[in-house]
């Protein structure tokens, strides 16, 4: 039996937006069963709620952003990834700005916040999206694909012409029946190249970026004094992003995901293509007395 989960307590954090550079106050609150993840812009009058829904994605340039009722919520993918990795279904995310705080560029601080708040099971079974048929989307040589699989696994391949990202460190697979999100994925940070800085600044992107919240590379090396957290941290972060982007489908995935040079835009296109093909997926749950789901989550943390 796998139940829905929410937070036991409310918890708050402060940070800066990666792209806006704005200071942002964030509050995570418990939510009732079947509520889902809902963002709330408390700086607006009246307050505007924006559900975590793939159909509301309007921004995929260097982040995943949502728009609803005139309100924007930017850079949701790292928190969404942490929620997916810890199996949290229902939460209210209050924000004082249009962008989530970037924290250290990974999902690790969000995992810490969620565990500090306490994670509790609720009265109704968790709902999974089971992949029944292969769904694939492409953009040039980029590919993102769902396939049926009894569990949840992700494979990702990146290609960067850079000495710090050799081919042998450009491929990663993770299966959540045997691997732990917290240790294997959550600490992988976002990354960027000095050569792209001018492009980003011209578009008012990356204004809050620094070596405190991203891996920065020049033409030859990593510039961060502390180096990398994993030898293949770059591709692990791409998996972290994908987990967050896919959680916008509205439920935990039971299936296999494969990405080749994919990013936020193609991940969102894949989720939309899946949801539009009703023969390709189904809702499933595992009530008491039935089989266990073929994916494991950490035990609830009762703070």
From Swiss-Prot:
Q: Which SUPFAM superfamilies match?
A: Ribosomal protein S5 domain 2-like
Under the heading NCBIfam families, the entry gives: lpxC (TIGR00325)
A single BP term in Gene Ontology: lipid A biosynthetic process
InterPro entries noted in UniProt: Ribosomal_Su5_D2-typ_SF (IPR020568), UDP-acyl_GlcNac_deAcase (IPR004463), UDP-acyl_GlcNac_deAcase_C (IPR011334), UDP-acyl_N-AcGlcN_deAcase_N (IPR015870)
Instruction: Cite the HAMAP family for this sequence.
Output: LpxC
The molecule here is called UDP-3-O-acyl-N-acetylglucosamine deacetylase
What Gene3D superfamilies does this protein's entry cite?
A: lpxc deacetylase, domain 1, lpxc deacetylase, domain 2
């Amino acid at each position: 039996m796998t139940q829905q989960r929410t937070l036991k307590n409310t918890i708050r954090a402060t940070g800066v937006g990666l792209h806006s550079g704005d200071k942002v106050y964030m509050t995570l609150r418990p939510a009732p069963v079947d509520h889902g993840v809902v963002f709330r812009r408390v700086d607006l009058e009246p307050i505007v709620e924006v559900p975590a829904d793939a159909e509301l994605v309007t921004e995929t340039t260097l982040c995943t952003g949502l728009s609803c009722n005139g309100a924007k919520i930017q850079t949701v993918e790292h928190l969404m990834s942490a929620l997916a990795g810890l199996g949290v279904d229902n939460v209210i995310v209050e924000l004082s700005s249009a962008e989530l705080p970037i924290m250290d560029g990974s999902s690790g601080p969000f995992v810490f916040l969620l565990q500090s708040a306490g994670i509790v099971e609720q009265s109704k079974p968790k709902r999974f999206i089971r992949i029944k048929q292969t769904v694939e989307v492409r953009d040039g040589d980029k590919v993102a694909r769902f396939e049926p699989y009894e569990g949840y696994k992700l494979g990702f391949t990146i290609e960067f012409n850079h000495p710090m990202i050799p081919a042998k460190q450009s491929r990663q697979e993770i299966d959540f029946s045997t691997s732990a999100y917290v240790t294997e994925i959550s600490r992988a940070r976002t990354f960027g190249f000095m050569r792209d800085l001018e492009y980003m600044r011209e578009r008012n992107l990356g204004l809050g970026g620094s070596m405190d919240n991203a891996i920065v590379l020049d033409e030859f090396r990593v510039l961060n004094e502390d180096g990398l957290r994993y030898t293949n941290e770059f591709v692990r972060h791409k998996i972290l992003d994908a987990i967050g982007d896919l959680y916008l489908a509205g439920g935990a995935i039971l299936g296999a995901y494969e990405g080749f040079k994919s990013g936020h835009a193609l991940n969102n296109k894949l989720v939309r293509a899946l949801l539009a093909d009703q023969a390709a997926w189904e809702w499933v749950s595992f009530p008491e007395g039935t089989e266990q789901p073929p994916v494991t989550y950490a035990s609830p943390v009762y703070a």
